[in-house]
């Protein structure tokens, strides 16, 4: 998480120096609790240094409104907001819908066009780190060679399951269960090994 202008500038410099590809920037401006996570002067550095070298930025609705100055009250507003961000910063924009009360649909604006990615809303208190998980999963899939739409689809599927299997750790909002699929694969492998032993 880049909370200061100095951190953002250093990160942007290093990414440019190493010619990094598939940069996904999640502008973490505030926590779901409302707590501010970035200094005011750092927002300009996000806009001017990090966004222009990113392949994709992934603001949620409140962040998209803050970055664009456009009020989002409908899907049409969200399209207009994402288009403004795309045209202003020259990168693809995934406007996340987790803060929408009715749906969890995400909006991608890229290459001059938009596309909706339907999402399933899950009633789960343990959602700490959802946005970071989604953006990291998108970056991982881009690094594997998947195109942007496929990377988003795969990342949304992974994140949805990680939310569904969220970990209940003490009080407050717990984290997602990032290893949910790893555990299931281990279980499947163990069953297969057991069956092989039984058959032999």
Can you describe what each PLM-predicted range is?
Residues 1-49, 59:
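Glycine/small-residue-rich loop that forms an oxyanion/phosphate-binding "nest" at active or ligand-binding sites
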Residues 26, 60, 96, 131, ...:
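Residue-level signal for inorganic ion chemistry
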Residues 29-31, 97-101, 121-123, 156-159:
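Glycine-rich beta-alpha junction loops
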Residues 40-114:
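Conserved phosphate/ATP/ADP-binding segment of small-molecule kinases
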Residues 65-66, 124-148:
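Short, small-residue alpha-helix embedded
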Residues 71-78, 143-153:
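Short, charged, surface-exposed loops that flank catalytic or proteolytic processing sites
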Residues 114-128:
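Short pre-catalytic strand/loop immediately N-terminal to key active-site residues, enriched for Gly-Thr
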Residues 149-200:
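Charged C-terminal helix
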């Amino acid at each position: 998480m880049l909370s200061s202008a100095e951190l953002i500038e250093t990160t942007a410099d290093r990414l440019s120096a190493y010619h990094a590809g598939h940069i996904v920037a999640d502008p973490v401006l505030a926590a779901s609790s409302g707590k501010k996570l970035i200094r005011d002067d750092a927002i300009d550095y996000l806009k001017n240094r990090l966004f222009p070298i990113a392949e994709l930025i992934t603001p949620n609705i409140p962040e998209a409104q803050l970055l664009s100055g456009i009020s989002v009250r409908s899907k049409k507003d969200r399209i207009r907001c994402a288009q403004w961000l795309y045209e202003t910063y020259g990168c693809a924009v995934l406007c996340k819908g987790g803060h929408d009360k009715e749906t969890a649909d995400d909006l991608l604006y890229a290459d001059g066009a938009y596309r909706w990615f339907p999402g399933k809303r899950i009633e789960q208190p343990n959602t700490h780190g959802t946005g970071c998980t989604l953006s990291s999963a998108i970056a991982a899939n881009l690094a594997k060679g998947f195109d942007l739409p496929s990377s988003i689809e795969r990342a949304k599927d992974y994140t949805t399951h990680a939310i569904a299997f969220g970990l209940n750790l003490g009080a407050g909002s717990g984290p997602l269960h990032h290893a949910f699929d790893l555990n299931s694969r281990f279980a499947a492998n163990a069953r297969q090994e057991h069956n092989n032993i039984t058959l032999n």
